[in-house]
Amino acid sequence: GLIKKKFNGVPHYLIDAKFEPGNYGKIQFSPTLQCTYDNLNKLHKGSKPKYFEYFEGDKKKNVIFEQWYPEDGGRFYLKRVKNMIIETEDDIVASESHIWITMYQLKQLLKKDNLVNAHLRSVISYL
């Protein structure tokens, strides 16, 4: 899921810089929230992912887009992902790994190979 917020009338999107095994290069930018069913439901006894409450919790408001898709274009049998874009007026402080960017800035990132992951590309395709 992706959180949208306007700063001085300009839409910004909260994205996450992830260091994950298998990433080509150092980091990839991903949606605000990208997690598995097990993470969401704390099946491994961990804590809820950052910003979860904006997508499924008490702060879920103003859903711009919400749609289920097959995982990785149907490559994974019976796996599905939910893409969401929500807009908020809340004052959200970006965590250490998150950053607010404009669509123009995001488009500039898309020009570089392997900087924007497939999940973020999928979510912004609605925009």
Go through each PLM region and give its residues.
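Short beta-strand micro-motifs enriched in acidic
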Residues: K5-F7
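Mixed-charge (acidic/basic) macromolecular-recognition segments
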Residues: V10, P21-G25, S30-L127
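Active-site ExK catalytic segment of metal-dependent nucleases
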Residues: L14-E20
